[in-house]
Amino acid sequence: MRVLVQRAKRGSVRVDQKTVGDIGPGLVLLVGIHQEDTEADVRFCAEKVAHLRIFEDSSAKMNESVLDQGGSVLSISQFTLYGDCKKGRRPNFMRAAKPEKAKLLYERFNSYLRELGLVVETGEFGAMMEVELINDGPVTILVESE
């Protein structure tokens, strides 16, 4: 599993010109599910993301998590995180999980984040989306379960 974590001042996602998710300060997550991912991978990444200390404390050191800050999360499914570009010029997405499995694990990931105490907004799985964010920093971290 791969989660591209972006610290954001705000973020939103639209489907068919309708806003389906909107957050203030927090994290924008692009979430990719691998074909061999399991519930353990999902739980690991949710725990890591929720407790990742990438927000500044009162001493201006990256020492606080999104939970510490009371921030929220915008979670977007993103199978293209498993695009392999080693051969040719068109990415190969064979390592990405099939949609049925990916949707189930993506929903479990978001549920785990909520269980940890986060407010989670999402895009629409499998839809063409317009994602907007204002990066904060910028701070961008790749969390992987493998």
From Swiss-Prot:
| Compartments in which it is found | Cytoplasm
Its recorded reaction(s) are: glycyl-tRNA(Ala) + H2O = tRNA(Ala) + glycine + H(+); a D-aminoacyl-tRNA + H2O = a tRNA + a D-alpha-amino acid + H(+)
Q: What class of enzyme is it?
A: hydrolase
Q: What is its EC number?
A: 3.1.1.96
| Gene3D superfamilies per UniProt | D-tyrosyl-tRNA(Tyr) deacylase
Q: Which UniProt keywords apply?
A: Cytoplasm, Hydrolase, RNA-binding, tRNA-binding
| Function, in words | An aminoacyl-tRNA editing enzyme that deacylates mischarged D-aminoacyl-tRNAs. Also deacylates mischarged glycyl-tRNA(Ala), protecting cells against glycine mischarging by AlaRS. Acts via tRNA-based rather than protein-based catalysis; rejects L-amino acids rather than detecting D-amino acids in the active site. By recycling D-aminoacyl-tRNA to D-amino acids and free tRNA molecules, this enzyme counteracts the toxicity associated with the formation of D-aminoacyl-tRNA entities in vivo and helps enforce protein L-homochirality.
Could you describe the subunit structure of this protein? Homodimer.
Q: What protein is this chain from?
A: D-aminoacyl-tRNA deacylase
Q: What is the lineage of its organism?
A: Bacteria, Bacillati, Bacillota, Bacilli, Bacillales
